[in-house]
Design a protein with these regions (language model features):
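N-terminal signal peptide c-region/cleavage motif recognized by signal peptidases
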Residues: 17-19
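Repetitive helical segments and hydrophobic/amphipathic motifs
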Residues: 11-12
Length: 382
């Protein structure tokens, strides 16, 4: 009887032990609908192109749409972890959603690779952000590129309008520092919501400040609204956008008014225009060719590249993690986190990654170029 009882207790206990699984499971949370859809749709498309095998293990990608809503992003993340037992979370597409997910990554000890831009997602690398990485360039890296270009063009004063959320605030914080270093003064700062349909009031205030240039700190198609409104009102200064607009949907919505606009971008956007010596060109062209073969010529967007790059990080980290533990276990997730943090000189479509315990983005100036919109096309500024 005692032996039978012990066997029963042992069997019951096994039900609560983490079970290794035969494949790597990746949960992907994207904003494929809602205000951020122009970012999330190319990422959703990219999810169909990802490798089915990594380091000899089959990979199961489970893709959910958070509708551009932070609450949904958190709910989706918990579902993927508790019900699907994923080893890695990739997402979300935008900063507010990704920031909301950071606590869940820390609580569950599941590594997360964000596809959003703000440095606040990964900085500082404290107990929470210990589990969080991201593939897009930090806004600080891109802000200095804009300030450098402004200074080279003799711009002394700037008006700024940005999203009334963490993306806009992060850009205001970082660009303020970059501008000050170049003796450029921000003479007015306005905010608007991603879902707003009019920014006339903000535009009138910007124009009253009479700046040499305007910087719009938005992402996706909603970033076109301030620029088109400024053009309608006759503002004739220089226009700058952030890397959050680097897709063809923005060009379609903004149209001719956006010709002449300058912005920093990951090198993927103009991969074909890069010199062959550029360390990102080969990866960028491979992604571009795969995407356009599936979805049509001219459809590639930088935002899809961030998902592609996240899986490149997984491909490089998984072999090391598999030496320690099997997928589906806390030990594997921890080993995978450690392996990602120790990646060095890994070329991705948006730069070359060198992670460290204090840097969970790992990108340097090789991860940015300046681009100008000319006749509705992206043109590398040389």
């Amino acid at each position: 009887m005692k032996r039978a009882l012990c066997a029963g207790v042992t069997a019951a206990a096994l039900l609560y032990l983490p079970m290794a699984q035969a494949q790597i499971k990746v949960g992907i949370i994207l904003s494929a609908t809602g205000p951020a859809a122009s970012l999330g749709i190319p990422q959703k498309n990219t999810s169909t192109l990802l490798p089915k095998t990594i380091a000899g293990q089959s990979v199961d990608y489970i893709v959910l749409d958070d509708g551009s809503d932070p609450t949904n992003a958190v709910k989706d993340m918990r579902k993927l972890i508790t019900e699907d037992n994923v080893d890695l979370i990739i997402g979300s597409s935008v900063t507010p959603n990704s920031l909301a997910m950071v606590d869940v990554a820390a609580e569950t000890k599941v590594p997360m690779i964000s596809l959003a831009a703000s440095a606040k997602i990964i900085q500082p690398v404290d107990d929470k952000r210990h589990w969080v990485f991201k593939t897009p360039q930090n806004d600080s890296l891109m802000a200095t590129a804009i300030a450098d270009n402004m200074a080279a063009n003799g711009i002394k004063t700037v008006g700024m309008i940005g999203f009334s959320d963490a993306y806009g605030q992060g850009w205001h914080d970082e660009f303020s520092k970059a501008a000050a270093a170049k003796n450029i003064k921000i003479v007015d700062y306005e905010e608007y919501s991603r879902a707003d349909t009019s920014v006339t009031g903000q535009v009138l205030k910007l124009m009253a400040a009479n700046p040499d240039a305007i910087l719009v700190a938005g992402s996706g198609t909603p970033a076109a609204l301030p620029e088109t409104t400024l053009k309608e009102r006759g503002y004739a200064g220089k226009y700058y956008q952030t890397h959050g607009v680097a897709n063809n949907d923005f060009l379609r919505v903004c149209g001719k008014p956006c010709n002449g606009t300058l912005l920093p971008s990951g090198p993927l956007l103009v991969a074909a225009q890069l010199p062959d010596s550029n360390p990102t060109k080969k990866v960028g062209m491979a992604y571009t060719e795969a995407y356009e073969k599936a979805f049509g010529v001219g459809t590639v967007a930088t935002f899809g590249g961030h998902l592609w790059d996240a899986v490149i990080l997984l491909e490089n980290a998984a072999p090391t993690a598999l030496k320690t533990a099997k997928p589906g276990t806390p030990q594997f997730r921890s080993a995978l986190r450690d392996a990602i943090e120790n990646l060095h000189e890994v070329p991705i479509s948006h730069g070359v990654v060198n992670m460290s315990p204090t840097d969970h983005s790992g990108l340097d100036t090789r991860g940015r170029v300046m681009v100008e919109i000319e006749d509705g096309k992206w043109v590398l500024v040389k």
